[in-house]
Amino acid sequence: MQTILGAGGAIGTELLKELMRRQQPVRLVSRNPKEVQGVTETVAADISNLPQTIAAVAGSTVVYLLAGLKYDTKIWHELWPRIMSNAIEACKRANAKLVFFDNVYMYGKVVAPMTEETPFNPCSKKGEIRAQIATSLINEFKSGKLCAMIARSADFYVPDPRTSVANVLVFDKFAKKQKASWLINDAVPHSYTYTPDAAKSLALLADSESAWNQTWHVPTAPNPPTGKEFIRMAAKEFGVEPKYRVLSRPLIKVAGLFDTDIRESYEMLYQSDSAYVFHSSKFTKAFGQESTSYADGVRCTALAYQARLRAGAAISG
């Protein structure tokens, strides 16, 4: 049994598709799980609660920790260490392997491309929390107490409307024939991971004995575009003019006075003011899975949006 903790997010949705394609028995765990045709089990559980987490993981061989919390430092500080501790303890009791899907906040602001060897040097409160929980898991598998791995992603974009920055600022807007936005600096390259690539790599990593007890960067296209180039690609696929505005720090700070999510994102703007380059060559060399090019990923994302519009589905934003 392969169990997804936090099954309702963008990565969980894509991972479910991949595991079902591989004909794996799957258990979906979330606070309010929805029945999905072909899924073996759905379990309602609060993974910040240890007994509920233990019960949700029981009988699993592989557990994917994909939880997404409200974008709030106070909530992260309170819940993330507890969730990681619960997942570790539950996997130990079930003799299950743990895959943690992580981001790059713990690296802080880096000049060189990010790799698995980039040291943790967080420059944000959220980054400090991510460094703490990643370190706790690394200590577990390095000491031989748990079979686990970390699969790390850059910022990502999603083939259907979700809350990733690229989707909210670019795809959602162009789908509604509106002007797009970009954060801080549109002239520097910014890596994005395409979520179907991430999901495929998670399933592949979990199925490979040689992948365990280490950190992997999931496949992400090389030679990332600048903000301006990314917007032009998206506009072309939506058949609109590449009109956009660059959101400055002062503007974002003022907007944060009226919007909690914007206020919480302010400390992460360092990721947008200079080059943000994410390398995944370790994965490619080990497994040969190539990442989807930006041109193809943007095209598929636009096509998914257009299909939703034809079906009468609403676009957020």
Sequence positions of predicted segments:
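Mid/C-terminal beta-alpha module of Rossmann-like enzyme folds, strongest
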Residues: Q2, S201-S265, T292, D296-G317
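N-terminal Rossmann NAD(P)H-binding glycine-rich loop of SDR-like oxidoreductase domains
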Residues: Q2-R22
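Conserved Rossmann-fold NAD(P)-dependent oxidoreductase catalytic core, especially the SDR/UDP-sugar
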Residues: R27, S85-R130, M149
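NAD(P)H-binding glycine-rich loop region in Rossmannoid oxidoreductase-like domains
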Residues: K34-A94
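Conserved beta-loop-beta element that borders a ligand/cofactor-binding pocket
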Residues: N103, T135-D160
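Glycine-rich "substrate-gating" loop/helix at the edge of Rossmann-like oxidoreductase active sites
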Residues: A154-S164, I184-P196, T220-P222
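A conserved pocket-lining segment of Rossmann-fold NAD(P)-dependent short-chain dehydrogenase/reductase
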Residues: D172-T193, S210-W212
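Conserved C-terminal active-site "lid" loop/helix of NAD(P)H-dependent oxidoreductases
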Residues: A255-E290
